[in-house]
A protein has these predicted regions:
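N-terminal non-cleavable signal-anchor helices
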Residues: 4, 12-14, 45
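N-terminal secretory signal peptides that target proteins for export/translocation
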Residues: 1-7
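Short, aromatic- and cysteine-enriched interfacial helices/patches
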Residues: 3, 23-24
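Scaffold/interface architecture of coatomer-like assemblies
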Residues: 24-314
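Bacterial N-terminal signal peptides
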Residues: 8-20
């Protein structure tokens, strides 16, 4: 699941009568109410064959912040409601790939449940909200299919706007929800006003899992020699952003590849564990805190979550 980066909470109220260690897909709700800082993590656990590991309990997780063991105060193994942001590159460089990108995005919409919400943003010379975060999946689907390719590419502007918009939707006292962002693009930024560092800083604050899908075509491959330096830089940026936030980075060559990619992301989001802890370090200094999760009593189980977070400032 995805919760928040750092959320202010004094009381975690579980509104589900069943225990928090139930199987995936179990309905569960939680409410946050203001006070001290809770650090919330989405954790995916896989075996050596990259299959998701289910059936874990809070006792199987050891959470460290800057090397110091933390007390886990919240744990859920249930599939919680999802807030999903789809960021769609519709610049001119996507002309030969826009239909593929649209099909992949609509696939995400079809996989969502009534309890989930979807935000759609496209990027050309600037970023704009095509469909606000809501349960209206039909409107989101229509917005996606109505896009066309033109203009330059402001990927970092789009990521920044999306992270800001998702953060704005977090309200004190609301039910606990997962949050994730999926970027479909050819990966080359050309006109953003904000920098990659700006996006990374905001991502570390927001705690939203970011998944990047880099689309390619035969034209892209033939241009690789000329664009090698730029392509390598943008590819590294997308991979680093996904890794830092606990998401994943994918490369898709054909529409059939994309179908498997979005199914893989959906399965992963449904298989996440939600973990929350009150950090022993209560300083509000804006410093970066490194987070490490280890699995106890499960040989070869490999956890993946965000690498850390930025502490709030006073």
């Amino acid at each position: 699941m995805h919760v928040t980066g750092t959320m202010k909470t004094l009381v975690l109220v579980l509104l589900c009568a069943a225990g928090t260690t139930g199987a995936f897909g179990q309905d569960q709700a939680a409410t946050f109410k203001g006070g001290v800082d809770l650090v919330a993590l989405n954790v995916v656990v896989v075996d050596p064959q990259q299959q998701f590991v289910g059936g874990l309990t809070a006792g199987n997780f050891a959470v460290y912040e800057d090397g110091v063991l933390q007390d886990v105060s919240f744990f859920a193994a249930a599939e919680l409601p999802l807030d999903l942001a789809i960021l769609l590159d519709t610049s001119a460089s996507m002309y030969d790939k826009i239909a593929t990108a649209q099909k992949a995005a609509v696939g995400f919409v079809s996989a969502l449940r009534p309890v989930d919400r979807l935000l759609v943003i496209d990027i050309k010379d600037s970023a704009r909200v095509l469909s606000p975060l809501s349960h209206d999946l039909d409107a989101a689907r229509s917005a996606i299919l109505g896009t066309s390719a033109a203009g330059s590419t402001a990927i970092y502007n789009g990521l920044y706007l999306t992270l800001k918009e998702m953060a704005r939707q977090k309200q004190p006292g609301q039910n606990l929800r997962r949050q994730a962002l999926v970027l479909l693009s050819d990966g080359d930024d050309t006109t953003s006003l904000v920098s990659y560092d700006d996006v990374m800083e905001l991502a570390r604050q927001a705690g939203i899992s970011i998944y990047t899908i880099k689309l390619r075509s035969s034209q892209f491959e033939s241009d690789m020699a000329r664009r090698n330096a730029q392509a390598s830089k943008s590819e590294y940026a997308m991979k680093e952003l996904a890794q830092e936030t606990g998401g994943r980075s994918f490369h898709a060559l054909q529409v059939n590849d994309l179908s498997g990619v979005y199914k893989s992301i959906g399965h992963e989001l449904a298989s996440q564990y939600a973990i929350g802890y009150m950090p022993t370090n209560q300083r509000r200094d804006g410093a970066y805190r490194r987070v490490n999760v280890r699995i106890v009593d499960r040989a070869n189980a490999q956890p993946r979550t965000r690498a850390g977070y930025l502490a709030p400032r006073k």
